[in-house]
Amino acid sequence: MMGPMASDETRTGTRTEGRTETPTRTTRSTTPGAPAARDARVPGPAPEATGTRAWTPWRVRLLVLGIVLAAVNLRPAITSLGALLEEVRDGLGMSGSVAGLLTSVPPLCFAVFGVAAPRLARRFGPGAVVFGGMVAITAGLLIRPYAGGTAGFLAATALALMGIALSNVLMPVIVKRFFPDRVGSMTGLYSMALAFGTSIAAAATVPMTDALGGHWQPGLAVWAALGAAAALSWIPFVRARKASASAGSPAHTGSAGATESAGAGAPRADAPAEQPPLRITRSRTAWALAVFFGLQATAAYITMGWMAQIFRDAGVSAGTAGLLLAVIMVMGVPLAFVIPRVATRLPHQGPIVLVLGVCGLAGYAGLYFAPAGGAWLWALLLGVSNCAFPLALTMVGMRARTGAGVAQLSAFAQSTGYLISIPGPLLVGVLYQHSGGWGLPIALMSALMVPQIVVGVLAGRDRTVEDEAAR
């Protein structure tokens, strides 16, 4: 599957990955003193000049599988709770304000723990950090339904969200480092997997809860199985340090598992150790991307935490409300693959931002005036708007030239963005409790879409943070 994708994206590799770099698809060694490289179409591992393990075809496929499984686990902890929020509130005796605090925990954890991801990856390697993240997700999901009381529930939720935060930040970094000429395709692939995990948890949590006896505890705990499966797939990469990128990167593996060497044993141009730290806060594009990330995250976590309840309060059954939430999330499966590929072919991503924003405004307007009457249409429109997330991830990869730049930009944009998004779900809960309805919260959601469009257009301009930070 990855072979055909690579050929499509080769044209955009140089523009996307760096405007001053040479194309990565080289078939002969160009490094003085390096062994002669194999022909690009002859299967076989790259030379192990650096002492790291070669990227054999099965290892490349296992890495792709690990990325997909990790992405599937990045949202079920949140959407499964959204589907059963009313039952959890009743079971733990939560008020609307406390429930609003609960829905604000994800962005808070993402902001606090996400900033540590690049430092941990430099010390232990990204594979080890993602593996640890999957273990934390598994443990948190197993513990939280049975922790006893609101405090224990929040603490176990925070443990799972810590694992999600670390993996959130490192996914764009791993894609940029190991698949530099396939950023659009690989971003689309793991964004599809993320959307699939999000939607399946929203749709299946209520039916599985009923099948498991009608108690919300096992209905939430069952999602730990996904985390365990993902953790197993990352075990082979626990000892893969950052230097492995210079010894036969999977980015240079063809569709038949062939290895394309650009100088055996030569350091990669995007090796983090070779890049000086960026003064990322001097980049206007970095700030625009961070605010865009924060506003789309605000909309996403309000949707995941409250949308099912909005439909239920409008007279929709619990099962149907879960399906409507799933429709919103499942729209990301096809669109999360299409949007990054389209975005990498455009010099400016502003038109995509505008289309997504208009869909969001239309969906919120319908939800305000006829929440139950046009519920399925509003869900479709909000599902399209929700695809601002894969677009933001794609722009993270496009707005920096190097792997080190992507790591810093990803950590900055996500951590700052999630800090921005913290008040949103909490404010929705407070407005709902004190107004007694959903009119004011929906008006707030709609109003936030306007600045999201503005900063998204600014973030989509064709420039890099390295150039801006150097000024």
Give the ranges of each region predicted by the language model.
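Juxtamembrane intracellular "pre-TM" segments in multi-pass secondary transporters
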Residues: 47-57, 239-289
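Conserved MFS/SLC helix-loop-helix module at the cytosolic interface between two early adjacent transmembrane helices
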Residues: 112-151
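Cytoplasmic helix-loop-helix junction between adjacent transmembrane helices
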Residues: 156-194
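Helix-loop-helix hairpin linking two adjacent transmembrane segments in secondary transporters
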Residues: 181-182, 189-242
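C-terminal transmembrane helical hairpin of 12-TM major facilitator-type secondary transporters
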Residues: 349-392
